[in-house]
Design a protein with these regions (language model features):
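Nucleotide/phosphate-binding catalytic cleft detector across ATP-hydrolyzing
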Residues: 1-166, 174-291, 298-313
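Acidic, divalent-metal-coordinating active-site segment for phosphoryl/phosphodiester hydrolysis
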Residues: 171
Length: 313
């Protein structure tokens, strides 16, 4: 069964299958799964048969460290399903751990989050993969609406609220009023794009090759959107692109911020564009209510202050 814009409180299980992380919420228990959206597989034969050997955190630890015949897969890209089979296996694995081996869903109603910018075909794919994993009924919920409900915004009121949902693959800006999305702008850059910017900067400035896990560590440790009172440094280990040998460099937060700035500016422009297209009466509400940031990318140092200064909210 395929439905849209549901009453979220009628559903016992909520699933957010993100590009970077998969989160499962149960009404009676809260968040019960928060794992990386990664699957590790081993090739069995030349016909393409695969054996799944790890999910989530265990699989993420293998990224960049696998021998021949084993690879890590991210089943989602830019907020949508890229590998239907692996997505199904991943959801089934997490739900089996919750409900007991060999059982299907204990609860028939499951709400699954998707970016509001995805197509109807992409929404249907999310529902189909959830049903294939064992759900009796599945509906899709736009991520900005789910985020708004999660933080306690009364979305059914005649009042404008802006939610900026910044995950790993997409950044989505939604103006919400009367239970619906009035304006929606999205750009397929977010946390992963920040990591890629760091990887590119390290290659260009230091001829140093690093992996995505190292880039993420740099972003978390010394990344920022605005200058800091006390700038930070950290030692980064990688492979020298010139001679192929191990190499250690000292990296400053200033360099990282410069690398991240184009991506942050693109997100900022997306928010500005959405606000510019918002009806005047709702803009008045935004001045009073401010803008809500959600998603892992929102944790970048100084990001909320930068957006506040740039957008006068």
């Amino acid at each position: 069964m395929l439905k849209f814009r549901p009453n979220l409180f009628n559903y016992e299980i909520g699933i957010d299958i993100g590009t970077v992380n998969t989160v499962i919420y149960m009404k009676s228990k809260g968040v019960v799964v928060n794992e990386p959206s990664v699957v590790a597989v081993r090739n069995i034969d030349r016909k393409g048969q695969k054996e799944i050997i790890a999910f989530g955190t265990d699989a993420k630890k293998m990224i960049g460290r696998t021998p021949i015949g084993i690879k890590t897969i991210r089943p989602l890209a830019n907020g949508v399903i890229a590998d239907f089979e692996m997505t199904e296996h991943m959801i089934r694995h997490y739900m089996k751990n919750l409900t007991g081996a060999g059982k299907l869903f204990s609860y028939p109603k499951v709400a699954v989050c998707v970016p509001a910018c995805v197509t109807e075909v992409e929404k249907r794919a999310v529902v189909e993969v959830t049903l294939a994993a064992g759900a009796k009924e599945a509906i899709v919920v736009e991520e900005p609406l789910a985020a708004a409900v999660g933080i306690g915004i009364a979305i059914n009121e005649p009042q404008g609220n802006v939610v900026v949902n910044m995950g790993g693959g997409t950044c989505e800006v939604a103006v919400i009023s009367l239970g619906g999305i009035v304006v929606n702008h999205a750009v397929r850059v977010a946390g992963n794009s920040l990591d890629e910017a760091i990887i590119s900067m390290m290659r260009q400035n230091y001829t140093l090759a690093i992996g995505e896990s190292t880039a993420e560590e740099i972003k978390i440790a010394i990344g920022s959107a605005l200058p800091m009172e006390q700038e930070l440094t950290m030692n980064v280990k990688g492979r020298d692109l010139v001679d192929g040998l191990p190499k250690v460099v000292t990296l400053s937060s200033v360099e990282v911020r410069e690398a991240l700035d184009p991506v942050v500016s693109q997100i900022e422009d997306t928010i500005r564009s959405a606000v510019e297209q918002t009806p005047p009466e709702l803009v008045r509400d935004i001045v009073d209510q401010g803008i809500v940031l959600s998603g892992g990318t929102a944790l970048l140092r100084g990001l909320s202050l930068r957006f506040s200064d740039a957008l006068n909210v």
